[in-house]
Amino acid sequence: MGCVCPQDAKNNEARNEFYQNNYEIEQKIRTNKTLMKCLIKLQRKVKQHYYRKNRKNLNNENEDEPLTYKHIATNKIDQKQLEELFKIYPPLNDDIDVEVRSPAQFSNKVIYFGEWDKNKNLRHGRGIQIWSDGAKFLGCWKNGKACGKGKLIHADGDVYDGDWVDDKPSGYGTYIHSDGTRYDGEWKSDKQNGKGKENWPDGTSYEGEYVDGKKHGYGIFKWADNSIYKGHFDNNNIHGKGIYAFADGREYNGDWVKNRLEGKGIFTWPDGRKYDGDYKNDKKEGYGIFEWPDGKKYKGEWKNGKQHGIGEYYDPDENTWKKGVWECGKRIKWIDD
C-alpha cells in the first residue's frame, strides 16, 4: 500500500480526532441532561395527577363511612350552574325514573346537587358535587358514580374535562394543569392509555402512544429549542429505534436503550462528518466508520468514544488505506502488510 506523509497525517488525525471527540462530549451532555430533564418533568406531572385522583374518589372519600346525607340550604350551591349544566348535557334517557332534589351533604361533608334515581336513592343523571377543599365535579352520573361526560375542577386549579366510567377518566379527555401544561387524548381507568398529546408552556410537546400513564410505543417529542425525537418509547424512556435531530443540525438515527445511544446507529454533523457503527452507553464502542468532509476515513475499533484497537485510515489525496493501531484516540503505530 502507498504511504502518507507522517507529520501531515498526524496533524490531520489529531485535528479530526479533536473535533470528533469534542462533539461527542456535547452530544453526551445534551442527551443525558436536557432529554432527561424533560422526561422527568413529564413523569412527575402525571404522577401528581394520579395522587390527587386517588385521594379524591368521586364516590366517597372514606369508603368505610356510611353514605348518609342531609338536605342543606340551597344557597350553598349555585342554582345557575345546575341550570347551565342541564343545557350542556342532555338527559340520560335510560328509562330510570329521576328527580332533581335540593342540595344534600354527605357525612364526609361532600355536597351534591342534581338528579337522583328515585327508586335506588343514588346520584343518577346530571349533577354537581363539591368537596370541602373547594374541588368540584360537574357532569353526568350513573348508579351513584361519575359516568359519561363531566368536568372535575381541582382545588389547586387543575381541570379534567372529558369522559368518565365508574368515577374514573376513561375515554377521551383533556387535563389542564394550573401551570399551563396540557394533555389531550385517550384515558383508561384514570391513566393515559392510547394516543394523546402533551404541551408545556415553554413550547415542549409530546405526541404519541401511552400505556398505563407512561409513554410507550411510537411518539414524537419536541423541545423548545426545536430539537426533536421521533421513535419508540418504553415505560416512559426513549428505547428502541429512533431519530434524534438536534437544533444545530446534528442527527442520530439508530438504537436506544433507556434514553442512551446503544446498539447500531448513524450520527451525522452539518459540516458533512458522519459516523456509522456501534454505540454503548452514549459513546462509540465496537466497530465503526468515521468519515470527514474532506474525504478522509477511519474504519475500525472504538472504545469509550475514541479510536481504540486496530483500524484503517484512508487518505483521499493518496487514494490509500493504511492499517494501524490506535489507543485512546491516538495512533500508536502503523502496521505493515
How would you name each of these model-derived features?
Residues 1-337:
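Intrinsically disordered, low-complexity repeat tracts enriched in Gly/Pro/Ser/Thr and acidic residues
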